[in-house]
Amino acid sequence: MSLVLYGHPLASFCHKVLIALYENGTPFENRIVDLMDETSSADLFRFWPVGKMPVLRDEALDSTIPETSIIIEYLDRHYPGPIRLLPDDIDRALRVRLWDRFFDLYVQAPLQKIVTDTLRPEGRKDPHGVEEARGTLATAYGMIEQQLGGNQWITGDSFTMADCAAAPALFYAETLVPFGDDQPKLRAYYERLLGQPSFARVLKEALPYFKFYPYSRQLPERIRNEMPSE
């Protein structure tokens, strides 16, 4: 198969690319990487020595594509499907890129900081950094609430790359800093994302791995009820 995605079912940034692939039914091989296993991770580091997932390998064009937004734009150009995840109109495309960056930088980054800090041993934790990260999430929620207005999706009526970024970011962030009662549009948007077939498929595939998430008890009840019993 021409396209091979190196990633992991628990990783939120991998979810973002999987949503894009599933939205358009793009054929690809989903290769799960265990970073703790040298054999499993060998190809990832060979193609992208930084070792960050996901990485897309296009064997047909002998191309290695890292970074989620670049991967999705690459797919949109070289393997277009019925759903254009990046509009042709320049101004609309800029809005999509802006909100794609917003979710990566101001939702994903702070949630990653909080989760990473949880895994640190005592004496190496960063309570000040965690407090800042929680504050960033709270600010981001308010901005998303305002941006949504009457939109179905984050930049309008069309599902785009920005919504691919939003889905996993909000899914994990909500387990750390729940949405406020004064954010009904954000909550409704979150529910629409959960109901999107592409994201529902991603979450279903991640069910066996959610037990490794440090905040698994804060996952939505509907997800916890579907997780395999140990």
Annotate each language-model stretch with its function.
Residues V17, L56, S198-F199, K211:
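Compositionally biased, intrinsically disordered low-complexity segments enriched
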